[in-house]
UniProtKB/Swiss-Prot annotation:
Protein name per the record: Protein ApaG
Domain ApaG: residue ranges: 3-127
Matches recorded under InterPro entries: ApaG_domain, ApaG_sf, Uncharacterised_ApaG
Gene Ontology terms: biological process: error-free translesion synthesis
Length: 130
């Protein structure tokens, strides 16, 4: 679990390797990640956009920009939480994701909050040798 707090908004990310959607022999790996955004502050905020930076083990970087998350632009009152799960494919067995969300406060102010960097790693495969 990876966590960052910006301006009383907590973002927690938990990645998980999805073996059933991966084909390691063909260099295709897939991870699901669950993100929870929690409003720990006193103002109502709305998540308006996202910016992800995804880097594989070869240093290839892809940037993803978009409105909201998973088709929604959730509003979080004080104490409110929003959780979603999405996925990312890579051509390498490791990588890293990071980024930020664009938020809108009740007073019309826009600001960015950090999405913590998190690693994408194929779980260790233990081999037993006799």
């Amino acid at each position: 679990m990876y966590r960052a707090i910006t301006r009383n908004i907590q973002v927690t990310a938990t990645p998980r390797y999805v073996a059933e959607r991966s084909e390691p022999d063909q260099g295709r790996h897939f991870w699901a990640y669950t993100v929870e955004v929690a409003n720990l502050g006193q103002e109502t905020v709305q998540l308006k956009g996202r910016h992800w930076v995804i880097t594989d083990a070869n240093g290839h970087t892809e940037e993803v920009h978009g409105a909201g998350v998973v088709g929604e632009e959730p509003t979080l009152p004080p104490g409110g939480r929003f959780e979603y799960t999405s996925g990312v494919p890579l051509n390498t067995s490791t990588g890293i994701m990071s980024g930020h969300y664009e938020m809108l406060a009740d007073n019309g102010e826009t600001f960015s909050i950090e999405i913590p960097a998190f690693s994408l790693d194929v779980p260790d495969v233990r081999r037993v040798l006799n």
